[in-house]
A protein has these predicted regions:
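Solvent-exposed beta-strand/loop surfaces of large extracellular or lumenal domains
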Residues: 69-94, 113-120
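C-terminal beta-strand-rich structural cap/linker in extracellular carbohydrate-active enzymes
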Residues: 59-62, 93-108
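Edge strands and adjacent loops of beta-rich recognition modules
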Residues: 10-53, 62
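Single conserved hydrophobic/aromatic residue that forms the stacking wall/gate
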Residues: 1-9
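Beta-strand-rich binding/interaction modules
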Residues: 56-76
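Glycine/proline-rich low-complexity spacer/linker segments in large multi-domain proteins
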Residues: 107-185
Protein backbone atom coordinates (compact mmCIF):
# COMPACT_ATOMS: atom_id res chain seq x y z
CA UNK A 1 0.00 0.00 0.00
CA UNK A 2 1.20 3.50 -0.76
CA UNK A 3 2.51 5.35 2.26
CA UNK A 4 0.01 8.17 1.70
CA UNK A 5 -3.00 5.83 1.76
CA UNK A 6 -2.12 4.82 5.31
CA UNK A 7 -2.76 8.42 6.30
CA UNK A 8 -6.42 8.52 5.21
CA UNK A 9 -7.50 7.80 8.80
CA UNK A 10 -5.65 8.11 12.09
CA UNK A 11 -6.95 6.90 15.45
CA UNK A 12 -5.97 8.31 18.81
CA UNK A 13 -7.80 7.18 21.97
CA UNK A 14 -11.36 8.51 21.48
CA UNK A 15 -10.66 10.47 18.30
CA UNK A 16 -10.79 9.51 14.63
CA UNK A 17 -9.01 11.84 12.19
CA UNK A 18 -9.96 11.90 8.50
CA UNK A 19 -7.02 13.38 6.60
CA UNK A 20 -7.69 12.42 2.97
CA UNK A 21 -10.86 12.30 0.91
CA UNK A 22 -10.83 8.96 -0.87
CA UNK A 23 -13.63 6.38 -1.30
CA UNK A 24 -12.81 3.98 1.51
CA UNK A 25 -14.01 1.86 4.42
CA UNK A 26 -12.55 1.91 7.94
CA UNK A 27 -13.22 -0.74 10.57
CA UNK A 28 -12.19 0.51 14.01
CA UNK A 29 -12.15 -2.72 16.01
CA UNK A 30 -11.61 -1.09 19.44
CA UNK A 31 -14.77 0.99 18.99
CA UNK A 32 -16.68 -1.69 17.06
CA UNK A 33 -17.51 0.79 14.33
CA UNK A 34 -17.32 0.76 10.53
CA UNK A 35 -17.21 4.08 8.68
CA UNK A 36 -17.63 4.31 4.89
CA UNK A 37 -16.41 7.34 2.94
CA UNK A 38 -18.05 8.02 -0.43
CA UNK A 39 -16.73 10.77 -2.65
CA UNK A 40 -16.01 11.90 -6.19
CA UNK A 41 -13.64 14.55 -4.87
CA UNK A 42 -12.37 16.75 -6.50
CA UNK A 43 -15.09 16.50 -9.18
CA UNK A 44 -17.71 17.13 -6.49
CA UNK A 45 -17.47 19.42 -3.47
CA UNK A 46 -19.33 17.02 -1.18
CA UNK A 47 -17.88 14.10 0.77
CA UNK A 48 -20.27 11.68 2.44
CA UNK A 49 -19.56 9.38 5.38
CA UNK A 50 -21.87 6.64 6.62
CA UNK A 51 -21.64 4.75 9.90
CA UNK A 52 -22.37 1.14 8.94
CA UNK A 53 -21.77 -0.58 12.25
CA UNK A 54 -21.65 0.92 15.70
CA UNK A 55 -22.23 -0.03 19.31
CA UNK A 56 -23.36 3.55 20.01
CA UNK A 57 -19.93 4.63 21.22
CA UNK A 58 -18.98 8.25 21.82
CA UNK A 59 -15.89 9.59 20.11
CA UNK A 60 -14.71 12.68 18.24
CA UNK A 61 -14.66 12.67 14.46
CA UNK A 62 -12.16 15.22 13.13
CA UNK A 63 -12.42 16.08 9.44
CA UNK A 64 -9.50 17.91 7.84
CA UNK A 65 -10.48 21.46 6.84
CA UNK A 66 -8.07 22.35 4.00
CA UNK A 67 -6.80 25.92 3.80
CA UNK A 68 -8.33 26.37 0.32
CA UNK A 69 -11.85 25.35 1.46
CA UNK A 70 -13.05 28.61 2.98
CA UNK A 71 -16.69 28.26 4.00
CA UNK A 72 -16.65 24.49 4.53
CA UNK A 73 -19.57 23.05 6.50
CA UNK A 74 -20.45 19.70 8.01
CA UNK A 75 -23.83 18.14 8.77
CA UNK A 76 -24.92 15.01 10.60
CA UNK A 77 -28.15 13.36 9.45
CA UNK A 78 -29.03 16.56 7.55
CA UNK A 79 -28.48 18.94 10.48
CA UNK A 80 -25.67 21.50 10.08
CA UNK A 81 -23.16 21.29 12.93
CA UNK A 82 -21.74 24.35 14.65
CA UNK A 83 -17.96 24.47 14.59
CA UNK A 84 -15.34 27.10 15.32
CA UNK A 85 -12.72 25.53 13.06
CA UNK A 86 -10.77 27.66 10.62
CA UNK A 87 -9.23 26.59 7.31
CA UNK A 88 -6.07 24.60 8.04
CA UNK A 89 -7.61 22.98 11.16
CA UNK A 90 -10.05 20.09 11.77
CA UNK A 91 -13.85 20.26 11.89
CA UNK A 92 -14.71 18.32 15.06
CA UNK A 93 -17.94 16.50 15.91
CA UNK A 94 -18.18 14.71 19.26
CA UNK A 95 -21.20 12.48 19.85
CA UNK A 96 -22.43 8.94 20.35
CA UNK A 97 -22.40 7.47 16.85
CA UNK A 98 -24.92 4.85 15.75
CA UNK A 99 -25.38 2.71 12.66
CA UNK A 100 -27.08 4.73 9.93
CA UNK A 101 -25.60 8.11 10.91
CA UNK A 102 -24.67 10.13 7.82
CA UNK A 103 -22.05 12.86 7.83
CA UNK A 104 -21.76 15.28 4.91
CA UNK A 105 -18.76 17.54 4.44
CA UNK A 106 -19.20 20.39 1.95
CA UNK A 107 -16.00 22.05 0.75
CA UNK A 108 -16.68 24.82 -1.75
CA UNK A 109 -14.03 25.10 -4.44
CA UNK A 110 -13.31 28.22 -6.42
CA UNK A 111 -10.68 29.46 -8.83
CA UNK A 112 -7.72 31.02 -7.06
CA UNK A 113 -4.44 32.46 -8.27
CA UNK A 114 -1.30 31.61 -6.36
CA UNK A 115 1.69 33.78 -7.09
CA UNK A 116 4.82 31.89 -8.10
CA UNK A 117 7.68 32.56 -5.62
CA UNK A 118 10.08 35.29 -6.77
CA UNK A 119 8.07 36.01 -9.93
CA UNK A 120 6.00 39.12 -9.48
CA UNK A 121 3.64 38.63 -12.44
CA UNK A 122 3.54 34.82 -12.72
CA UNK A 123 0.67 32.87 -11.16
CA UNK A 124 -0.56 29.30 -10.89
CA UNK A 125 -4.28 28.74 -11.41
CA UNK A 126 -5.90 26.60 -8.72
CA UNK A 127 -9.38 25.11 -8.40
CA UNK A 128 -9.60 24.01 -4.78
CA UNK A 129 -6.46 21.89 -4.30
CA UNK A 130 -5.97 21.22 -8.03
CA UNK A 131 -3.40 23.09 -10.11
CA UNK A 132 -5.02 23.79 -13.46
CA UNK A 133 -3.23 23.40 -16.79
CA UNK A 134 -4.11 23.96 -20.39
CA UNK A 135 -3.14 21.96 -23.46
CA UNK A 136 -0.98 24.16 -25.69
CA UNK A 137 0.01 21.79 -28.49
CA UNK A 138 2.41 18.91 -28.97
CA UNK A 139 4.60 20.10 -31.83
CA UNK A 140 8.31 20.86 -31.31
CA UNK A 141 8.46 19.06 -27.95
CA UNK A 142 11.92 17.50 -28.45
CA UNK A 143 14.02 18.00 -25.33
CA UNK A 144 11.14 19.41 -23.27
CA UNK A 145 10.25 16.28 -21.29
CA UNK A 146 11.81 15.60 -17.90
CA UNK A 147 12.99 12.15 -16.88
CA UNK A 148 14.68 10.54 -13.89
CA UNK A 149 18.20 10.68 -15.31
CA UNK A 150 20.93 12.83 -13.80
CA UNK A 151 19.96 16.37 -14.78
CA UNK A 152 16.76 15.02 -16.35
CA UNK A 153 14.69 17.69 -14.62
CA UNK A 154 16.27 20.33 -16.86
CA UNK A 155 14.60 20.95 -20.22
CA UNK A 156 17.21 20.82 -22.99
CA UNK A 157 14.95 21.77 -25.86
CA UNK A 158 14.54 25.04 -27.68
CA UNK A 159 13.63 27.91 -25.39
CA UNK A 160 10.53 29.82 -26.40
CA UNK A 161 10.90 33.60 -26.18
CA UNK A 162 8.61 35.04 -23.50
CA UNK A 163 6.84 37.29 -26.02
CA UNK A 164 5.67 34.12 -27.86
CA UNK A 165 4.20 32.47 -24.78
CA UNK A 166 0.41 32.86 -24.43
CA UNK A 167 -0.41 35.52 -21.84
CA UNK A 168 -3.50 36.66 -19.97
CA UNK A 169 -3.88 40.41 -19.61
CA UNK A 170 -5.60 41.97 -16.59
CA UNK A 171 -5.40 42.17 -12.85
CA UNK A 172 -5.23 38.91 -10.88
CA UNK A 173 -8.78 39.53 -9.61
CA UNK A 174 -10.25 40.27 -13.06
CA UNK A 175 -8.59 37.17 -14.54
CA UNK A 176 -9.68 34.93 -11.63
CA UNK A 177 -13.26 36.23 -11.82
CA UNK A 178 -13.45 35.47 -15.55
CA UNK A 179 -12.69 31.75 -15.11
CA UNK A 180 -15.55 29.39 -14.22
CA UNK A 181 -16.11 25.65 -14.09
CA UNK A 182 -19.00 24.61 -16.31
CA UNK A 183 -21.55 22.38 -14.60
CA UNK A 184 -20.81 18.77 -15.41
CA UNK A 185 -17.20 19.42 -16.39
CA UNK A 186 -14.68 17.10 -14.78
CA UNK A 187 -11.32 18.33 -13.57
Amino acid sequence: MSRGLGDVYKRQKDTLYVNLFIPSRLTWKDKKITLVQETRFPDEEQIRFRVEKSKKKAFSLKLRYPSWAKGASVSVNGKVQETNAQPGEYLTIHRKWKAGDEITLNMPMQVALEQIPDRENFYAFMYGPIVLASPTGTENMDGLYADDSRGGHIAHGKQIPLQEVPALIGTPDSIRNSIHKNNGDRL
